[in-house]
Amino acid sequence: MRVISSSLILSSLLFASIASAAPNGKAGPVWRAAEKMRPAQLELLEQLVNIDSGTGDVAGGQKVSLIVADRLRALGMTVELLKAEAPNLPDNVVATLKGTGKGRLLLIAHTDTVFGPGTVAKRPYRTDATRAYGPGVSDEKGGVVEGIFAIQLLRDRGFRDFAEISFLVETSEERGSPGTRALIDRLVRQADVELNLEPGDAPDVMTVWRKGSTAFKIDVKGRPAHAGVAPQEGRNAALELIHQIQLADSLPKTGDGLTANVTLMSAGARYNIIPEDASATINVRLREKQQGDVVDAFLQKNAGITLIPDTKVIVSHEAS
């Protein structure tokens, strides 16, 4: 993440009237106020980054949620810690702030990362002249910090020309938000505008849309047999899975943002047994929901084309 006063950028996006208070850009009072916040921003960023909070790390994730909740509560927001909708996940934070005007704004950020336990010990937070480094510094603990300080900037300037600001800080985004899907749907329906605090493209570009993601799982059922005594009696699920993956790789390349890539594979239980079970997960990125239907139909068709006799292929859609 770039070490800049992102609070100014976000605040200007939230309410255009604040931007009008800074007609000279970086010379304006809002920019100067945001610049003064930089040390405090980086201090909070360091605190959050130096806590391991990979998705499913309940202890670390809960520590981060509590820190965020306390910071938002200190800004005068009404804060709730809500249990995740899926097991083995930390609490989500929902904070609201009432204003005196019109317009309901929803901010969404997440505190879980893709990094495993012990990552912080290996490469903790650090900075150089222009950047901050560490697990989750950009995706997306930096966004959480931006949201907190944007709200603080509005509060410090006495800006209340909005009906309500809601801030959801969730804890399972990196796995498709299984802990907040219903919550996100409810909050989005209550808002007039939603801003996602994921990092955009450099330099300082606001991203107005992103591709969606989903996953398909291919499960193959074969027949186990001893690999030395009677391999001919077996039906190798691993070989059929390889066949299905090769078929999947021939998915038509449409050129409109649809991609499908095998990301997980597993097969077998013991080294001397012909695998009875094998599975693979295909990560799909798409621009339109209908593209997922194209992939589903393609994989289901392939499931009926087996190379290894007596194996069964099941394709399931892991919606996200």
How does the language model describe each region?
Residues 1-6, 162:
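Positively charged n-region of N-terminal signal peptides that target proteins for export
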Residues 131-145, 226:
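Glycine/serine-rich anion-binding loops at beta->alpha junctions
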Residues 7-17:
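Bacterial N-terminal signal peptides
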Residues 47, 149-156, 243-249:
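Short glycine/serine- and small hydrophobic-enriched flexible loop segments
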Residues 22-26, 43, 53-54, 63, ...:
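Metal-dependent amide/peptide-bond hydrolase catalytic core
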Residues 140-213:
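Acidic/histidine-rich catalytic neighborhood of metal-dependent amide-processing enzymes
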